[in-house]
Every structure is written in structure tokens, then in C-alpha cells.
Amino acid sequence: MASKVYFSKTITAEKVLQMYTLLGKQLPGKVAIKVHSGEEGNQNFLRPDFWKPVVDHVGGTVVECNTAYPGQRNTTKKHLKLFETHGWSRYFTVDLLDAEGPDLVLDIPGGKVIQKNYVGKDLMNYDSLLVLSHFKGHPMGGYGGALKQLSIGIASAHGKAYIHGAGEPAKIWTANQDDFKRSMADAAMSVVE
């Protein structure tokens, strides 16, 4: 069966909500809305005011996880401050899924590279997941988007190093890139199943 593709020349918050409602999908239970908070000083992140109609429509909570590398997103305190700086906290409740450990370990029985995924334990508090992504070139993952949001984005700080290192966190920046990409696919599979 062919997939339906929706396209609009008009890009507004109202048009995105209209297109979402065309899907006719109801997300059951408590909804996590995965976003990328954006890096400090960078303008390449989704704007919270643009997504407010969709978030309000599904009644979701904005979620994210801390990073595995130094910066303004590697601790809960700094990351929440960045969410505030970028405007997310002005509109929404933000839940950092890995704010407190221990990690939730998801099995990946059919994983091609990794057989476990380490995610923020607060993921267990949600019944549904809506991923909001912006497409971008990424130096390690090829492209950043929904697959990266479902894998690296849901992973705890340790989980991010585990995925980047293709199962060996110490190789976070040196693992084979094809194995890293396969690890991302494995991790994403564990989140959606």
C-alpha cells in the first residue's frame, strides 16, 4: 500500500495542526512530545511558539534527555536553563527523561549491532510518543531527524555514548560510522516496539 504524503506551500502553526488532524490519529494515554532543545547560541531548533497548537491539541508533555558531552545540555540544571532560554519553558512543561537515574534498559533482541538500549527512565511514564524533528546535516549521523530523535534523543547520557560507540561507550567518538548508524536504527527500534 502506498503511503499518503501531505504537502503544503503554507508553513504556519495552524497549517501544521490542520495537517496533523488530517492523519486522523489519536495518541492514547499520556503523550510525550520529543523535541531537541537546541544548542546554546544556535538558531537551528524548532520554535516552541510554532508548535504550541500541536502540543496543546495532543495534550502532551515536552521531553528530552541530557547529552553525553560537555556543553549546556549535559546536566539537568543547565539543560532546563537552555529550555528556558529557547522559550520552551514559557509554553510547556518540560520533562528531562534522564534527570534522575537509574536508566531504563530496553532489550533489542533483533539488534544488528547492539542488543540493549539505555534510555531515560521517565519514558515509562508515557503511553504515546510524538516526535517533532527538524532535518539537518549531522557530522556523525549523516542526517539528523526522526530516527536520530528516537535513538540518540531518547537515550540517557550513558545510552548516547553506548549508541555512538556501537556498544562500547569508551569509543563514543571513534567507533565505525556504519556500526554507529546501525546502532541508531537498533535503538530506535527498541523505543517504538
Describe each region flagged by the PLM.
Residues M1-E193:
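N-terminal and secondary-structure boundary signal
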